[in-house]
């Protein structure tokens, strides 16, 4: 049994509608206890729509911004939404002692994701190693082991905060800090977190021929 998690505001509801409908159409709901949706700026009509789905639980956040932006401007609105993802994922993991799957709200479920999850790993990260840089992307993340998942989140969040100090103008912090965190943990002889891969060819459209 798993819980699911995503972040959504009104500007992304065009994607959120596809996300939730495709989830209910193409994924085995018997394997899902709760679908947690972090509200970073949903309108009343958005909330009303999402609450029609029986497994959905809305989580209030400390952000109420219905718009979005690109990643680069100072005080980027988009970035404010993204930075809540790891923070509240960790809170949900602590709250409900079940494995947790995070899928970005601008994704669409085309088949059952659970057949691609390696249960032997403590955490699973989305591997796109065909890229020349940043072999892992933060759009799909799984914590199978709650305690070690929280430890991984702690390391990831700490690395992200450090990256924001080191390179404040880069804009995209989430995936790059994830890559730095993974490399550091894999090179740490004291690390006890087993990190596995979920490949983009199975959970993302980047390698699918349409």
Q: What are these model-derived regions, one by one?
A:
Residues 1-73, 94-97, 145-147:
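N-terminal anchoring/stem segment of glycosyltransferases
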Residues 9-12, 42-43, 64-65, 107-109, ...:
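Short, solvent-exposed loop/turn segments at secondary-structure junctions
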Residues 13-16, 79-82, 171:
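A conditional alpha-helix N-cap/helix-loop micro-motif detector
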Residues 18, 22, 49, 88, ...:
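Amphipathic alpha-helical segments that form well-ordered structural scaffolds
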Residues 36-37, 101-104, 125, 191-198:
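A structural signal for short, well-ordered beta-strand segments and their strand-loop junctions
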Residues 70-80, 137-140:
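Short, surface-exposed amphipathic charged segments that create phosphate/polyanion-binding patches used
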Residues 81-135, 141-146:
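GT-A fold catalytic core of metal-dependent nucleotide-sugar glycosyltransferases
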Residues 149-210:
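Catalytic core and acceptor-binding pocket of nucleotide-sugar-dependent glycosyltransferases
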